[in-house]
Each structure stands twice: as structure tokens, then as C-alpha cells.
């Protein structure tokens, strides 16, 4: 009986350690689909022109050009800015045009960077 409980305790310890090791979640900054396009466009323009975001990935023939929608392009740019500057105090707000998600928005050849 003692051996049985020892095995159970070891199994539970193993499960706990395994799940806690995988419990680190990333955060990506993406466009909020509920926000009007004009707000999203203004935030995208600011991030590309003044914010220092990498907007090269959303250009034609680049990995994040497709799908060619405002929300998809804004998500790539907002995340670029957020990942680059979050350790310097940047947030994922963009005049309410963006939100944080713990779900990696990468798709196809378009990789959304995550910096710990």
C-alpha cells in the first residue's frame, strides 16, 4: 500500500512539474476587430511613420501581405511595435485599436514575433 501511494505522489509531482514548465504564455498585440477602420488606420499610420514599427512584412510579396486586410496588416505592425518596445514601457493600446492576446496569431509564412 505504501508503494502505491508513493507512485501516486511521484506521478502527481511529475504532472505538476510538467504543466508548470509549460505554463509560460506569450502575449501578442493585435488589432481589435470591434474598432472602426478609421481608428485602426490612424494607429497603423502612426506606428509605421512615427512609432518605429517594422512595416516591411506587410508590403506586397512579403510574408505578411496576405491576407490583404487592414486588420491583418495592423496586427502585424502593432505587434512589431509592442514586441520591440514593451521592455521600455510601451503598451498595446494604439488609441484603443489594439488588444493583447495569448494566442499566437502567426499564420502560413507570416510569423508574429514574441520577445520574452
Show the residue positions of the predicted features.
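Folded extracytoplasmic luminal domains of secretory or organellar precursors
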Residues: 2-116
Amino acid at each position: 500500500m505504501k508503494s502505491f501511494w508513493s507512485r501516486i505522489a511521484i506521478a502527481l509531482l511529475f504532472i505538476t512539474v510538467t504543466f508548470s514548465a509549460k505554463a509560460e504564455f506569450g502575449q501578442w498585440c493585435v488589432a481589435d476587430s470591434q474598432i472602426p477602420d478609421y481608428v485602426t488606420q490612424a494607429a497603423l499610420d502612426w506606428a509605421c511613420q512615427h512609432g518605429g514599427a517594422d512595416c516591411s512584412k506587410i508590403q506586397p510579396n512579403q510574408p505578411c501581405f496576405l491576407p490583404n486586410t487592414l486588420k491583418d496588416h495592423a496586427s502585424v505592425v502593432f505587434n512589431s511595435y509592442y514586441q520591440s518596445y514593451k521592455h521600455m514601457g510601451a503598451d498595446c493600446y494604439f488609441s484603443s485599436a489594439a488588444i493583447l492576446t495569448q494566442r499566437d496569431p502567426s499564420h502560413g509564412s507570416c510569423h508574429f514575433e514574441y520577445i520574452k
